[in-house]
């Protein structure tokens, strides 16, 4: 879709007026943040997922001529699993690993409309912009809200929105648009969306294991005033069943405690975060994901990533 500069400028102005402003702002701001501060080095654990995405997605986009010679295109992916396990953050870090690729992060509110068929129109406009800016990594957060299961009512406007998504997802990679999505509820997604050619890979991202939890504590504490004798392995053992968001909360809770102590202290600029304080923070915070929820996710994992499937519809990440 290369045109002369003046026509291209007019086209962009037109699209920016019709596509939700929030979506456009999010796309620009997240992309800049990713390039400056994010990358796989910011992720704790997820080694198998990093390798899978690097080999099947990032290397393909970063080496287009070689990929074209072998007829290879990046697959569309759905990351699913318990909340707070880093699916959205992974997508943002993933974008930072790719050269010259536009990153657009879309949330349900970005396409919401009070007008009948308004959301349907915005879906088409969004993909038009993504194609124009290609190559584009289009990331949908809370994907189940975009493509819920359809019912038998032909006049249901939400059915029409899902149908529009199906049309847009069909071989989107042929147009330079590469779709990655995340959800905590894959069972709510219309099954037609999950067919190969629309969503090629279903990847389960589970709870962080002990090594990942230790890495999370190291990353979260690395830039804070902390004692030198913190036993990270012990903290990891104490947080069995905690997700990434829980560990982040534990560190922030301890930070707030020390902040309030520091502003009272005149003799030293900062009070150090100690292991004892972190242990108290752990006792203060219960795991966000219950054992009942984990059993349900294990059932979903077996449903969506069965043992007899090929390697691209499998379990990776924190498991």
Give the role of each language-model region:
Residues 1-52, 73, 306:
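AAA+ P-loop ATPase mechanoenzymes
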Residues 4-5, 87, 293:
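Intrinsic-disorder-associated interaction segments
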Residues 8-14, 19, 111, 186-198, ...:
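A short, hydrophobic/aromatic-rich structural module that often spans a beta strand
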Residues 13-17, 55, 215, 219, ...:
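Charged/polar, solvent-exposed surface patches and flexible loops
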Residues 32-38, 47-51, 63-70, 237-249, ...:
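C-terminal engagement/docking regions of AAA+ P-loop ATPases
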Residues 34-237, 242, 254:
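Walker A/P-loop NTP-binding motif of AAA+ ATPase domains
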């Amino acid at each position: 879709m290369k045109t002369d500069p003046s026509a291209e400028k007019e086209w962009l102005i037109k699209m920016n007026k019709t596509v939700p402003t929030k979506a456009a702002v999010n796309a620009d701001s997240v992309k800049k943040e990713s390039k400056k501060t994010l990358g796989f080095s910011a992720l704790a654990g997820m080694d198998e997922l990093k390798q899978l995405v690097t080999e099947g997605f990032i290397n393909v986009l970063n080496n287009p001529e070689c990929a074209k010679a072998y007829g290879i295109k990046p697959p569309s992916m759905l990351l699913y699993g318990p909340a707070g396990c880093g699916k959205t953050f992974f997508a943002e870090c993933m974008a930072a690993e790719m050269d010259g690729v536009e990153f657009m992060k879309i949330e349900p509110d970005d396409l919401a409309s009070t007008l009948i068929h308004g959301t349907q129109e915005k879906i088409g406009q969004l993909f038009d912009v993504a194609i124009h800016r290609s190559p584009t990594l289009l990331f949908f957060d809370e994907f189940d809200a975009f493509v819920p299961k359809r019912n038998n009512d032909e006049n249901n406007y939400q059915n029409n929105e899902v149908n529009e998504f199906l049309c847009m997802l069909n071989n989107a990679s042929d147009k330079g648009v590469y779709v990655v999505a995340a959800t905590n509820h894959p069972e709510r997604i219309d099954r037609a969306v999950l067919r190969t050619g629309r969503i090629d890979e279903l990847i389960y991202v589970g709870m962080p294991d002990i090594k990942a939890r230790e890495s999370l504590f190291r990353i979260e504490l690395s830039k804070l005033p902390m004692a030198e004798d913190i036993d990270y392995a012990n903290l990891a053992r104490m947080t069995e069943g905690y997700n990434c968001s829980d560990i982040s909360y534990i560190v922030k809770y301890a930070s707030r405690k020390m902040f309030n102590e520091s502003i009272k202290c005149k003799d030293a600029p900062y009070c150090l975060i100690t292991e004892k304080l972190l242990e108290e923070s752990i006792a203060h915070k219960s795991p966000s994901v219950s054992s009942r929820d984990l059993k349900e996710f294990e059932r979903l994992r077996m449903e969506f990533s069965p043992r007899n499937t090929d390697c691209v519809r499998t379990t990776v990440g924190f498991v």
